[in-house]
């Protein structure tokens, strides 16, 4: 089995696609009007308009209703990203903090309220854990 993507459902596709394009520096592919994909080296971030939910079953997902998932990106320098993103991010949850498991992280909400974590492994153990990934 191969992990292929994570999909965010939104009522405002263009706004959310623009946010993630600015966050990642990657231009989204648009295989269909209500759908976009940002293809990163490790996984694809898919963004679908809420009208696509009916294709999976009415009510199977609700835009902006995520309370249990954090979308995470490993970056080279989380402190530099924090500085870069200050004008893009409206709601910061956590400023740069070194976590007990060895990652230095920032946590914020995207325009739909989804939690996003950017992190850099900073301890020797964390650096070793991510080698080869």
Language-model features, listed with the residues they occupy:
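Vicinal oxygen chelate
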Residues: 1-4, 26-72, 82-109, 120-133
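Helix N-cap motif at beta-to-alpha junctions
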Residues: 12-13, 76-78
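Conserved beta-strand-loop-alpha-helix junction that forms the acyl-donor binding cleft
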Residues: 10-12, 100
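Conserved active-site tyrosine of GNAT-family acetyltransferases
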Residues: 16-21, 85, 113
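Acidic active-site catalytic centers that drive phospho-/nucleotidyl reactions
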Residues: 77, 110-112
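Short hydrophobic/aromatic beta-strand micro-patches
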Residues: 9, 72-74
């Amino acid at each position: 089995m191969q992990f292929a993507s994570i999909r965010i459902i939104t009522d405002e596709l263009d706004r959310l696609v623009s946010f993630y394009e600015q966050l990642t520096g990657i231009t989204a592919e648009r295989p269909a009007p209500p759908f976009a994909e940002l293809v990163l080296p490790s996984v694809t971030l898919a963004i679908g308009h809420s009208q696509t939910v009916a294709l999976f079953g009415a009510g199977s997902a609700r835009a902006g209703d995520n309370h249990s998932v954090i979308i995470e990106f490993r970056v080279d320098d989380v402190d530099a990203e924090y500085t870069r993103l200050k004008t893009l991010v409206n709601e910061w949850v956590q400023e740069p903090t070194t976590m007990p498991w060895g990652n230095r992280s920032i946590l914020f909400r995207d325009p739909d309220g989804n939690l996003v974590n950017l992190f850099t492994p900073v301890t020797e153990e964390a650096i070793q854990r991510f080698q080869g990934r």
